[in-house]
Amino acid sequence: MLKKYKMGFDIWAMVVFLIIMIPNFIWSAVPAPNDILRTESATKVIDTIGSIFQVLMIFTLCVFINPKRKKLSFTKTIIAMICCCVIYYCCWVFYYLGVTNWLVIMGLTIPPCMAFLFFAIDRKNYISIVPIAIFTVCHIVFGVVNFII
């Protein structure tokens, strides 16, 4: 499978990562009024596994390039990725307005993962699907266990 890819650097993968991380950078510097995300996690092992696969996800998205991918354009998958980012940003707005219900928590959890998945599919970067899937599962478990149940 690796033979189908070349090693390089996909600047757009890094751009997508940074766009998704901007609210996290803001959150690190400016706490929300009802900041439940700063509580101690009950899923530390899952969080560690998730962090490892998040790094692998970004690494595989940025480094492995499928030469058969098309030029980046507004395909259905890129539009889906953008929609996921918009939903994610909207959920951050609600979070900063003090809304911390299950819908907002899942909105902070699932859409960014789906954005990475749609980007990977569009770029034909199938190597990154496994780390994205594992990171997504860990991210959902973290959100559900720590903030919903």
Q: Which role fits each region the language model picked out?
A:
Residues 79-101:
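C-terminal halves and exits of single transmembrane alpha-helices
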Residues 57-60, 87-88, 110-119, 135-139:
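Hydrophobic, membrane-inserted alpha-helices
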Residues 31-43:
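Membrane-interface helix termini and inter-helical loops of multi-pass transporters
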Residues 2-8, 66-75, 122-129:
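Membrane-interface helix-boundary motifs at transmembrane edges
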